[in-house]
Amino acid sequence: MSIETLELKSCIQCGRCSGGCPVSMKSSLNPRKLVYCYLNDLCQGMSADELGLWECTTCTTCTERCPKGVRPADLVVEMRSKVIESGRMTTQIRGALESTYLQGNPWGRGREKRMDWAEGLDLPILKPGGKTDVLLFVCCTNAYDPRCQPAARALVQLLRAAGVEFGVIGEEETCCSSEQRRIGEQGMFEELRDSNTKLIMERGPKRVVATSPHSFNAFKNDYPGLSVPVMHYTQLLAELLEAGKLKPKRQIEEVVTYHDPCYLGKQNMVFEEPRQALQALAGDRFVELDRSRETSLCCEGGGGRMWVDSAGKGRLAEVRVRDSIDLGATILATACPYCTLTLEDAVKTTDSEAKLRIKDIAELLAESL
């Protein structure tokens, strides 16, 4: 990227980016200063930690708030790429990248275990040359993390209940590389983008449904060769509910609220579909957080932050948990595996297990059938 591409010269140093940045108050990251520093060649000799590069969650709140179209989050990714090229990265980030290269996922798990989440489900494995309505892209976190696997299994239950023709890639499914790109590993992203595009297209799907907003965003916006419609799973569920193919049999009797994942909400404007599912389940017991939709507070899970220790006191996910409890909710729903993990951890670190449960929307809907 260039200064011109990022519209950096349009910056008027108004500070709206830093004022909206969810982590700037507790870390060295300051989007306004970073743009100024970059434009005036003042970043030379400063470390990534001094610049706060690893603190950015790439939530793009800074970009959304900029009145001149400057994209500070993209500048962070560009500057990170220089750090990655030099080899100056944390052990955690290096491990995630090496695991992606060797095993096709950033979690250090063997490729042969990628389908363990689906044990006993007898899922159709799509082969090259075949055809299907929906190719379900499970994503690395839902495939490997024990907390997120139930959400993937619940989604399978829902698709079957609705009579959807679908299949999965199986053990060959490989990381979408969305987070690797945001970390700054552009070369790895391009390689996986091309191989994943081929892997998906040769299986003949009419559409791709992603369980993760990060995979959804990558396929929709960063995979130009993917010539079939891409959906997040909540969009498909809303479609099935509206068509009457999914009919909840039991209403949720608890107060439910919803955390908008950044990569689903403010970056792709998918706000209504998740709420349609929750309103079908909870009716007027569904309540909105004060910071929701375009102004939703980031949980700190994106932009490679799953492999970076959080700086400063307190975590944004803990704020989200407290806000939910103050609202009177006993269930905080979301639609992203990273959000599920950060929020679940925040429930524990705030000693709120008896007050609040974190649930994926697919889990809630499957429980109602």
Where are these regions (language model features)?
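Cofactor-cradling patches in redox/metallo enzymes
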Residues: N142-H232, Y263-A280, R285-L369
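C-terminal amphipathic alpha-helical segment
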Residues: E242-L278
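Short, surface-exposed amphipathic charged segments that create phosphate/polyanion-binding patches used
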Residues: L240-E254, E300-M306, S368
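Short, charged low-complexity linear segments at domain edges
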Residues: M1-I3, S27-S47, E272-A282, G304-V308, ...
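Hydrophobic scaffolds flanking metal-cofactor catalytic centers in soluble metalloenzymes
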Residues: L8-R16, P22-N40, E50, C148-A151, ...
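Iron-sulfur-cluster electron-transfer modules
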Residues: T5-L8, M25, V35-T211, F216-Y223
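Short cysteine clusters
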Residues: C11-C17, C21, C56-C62, C66, ...
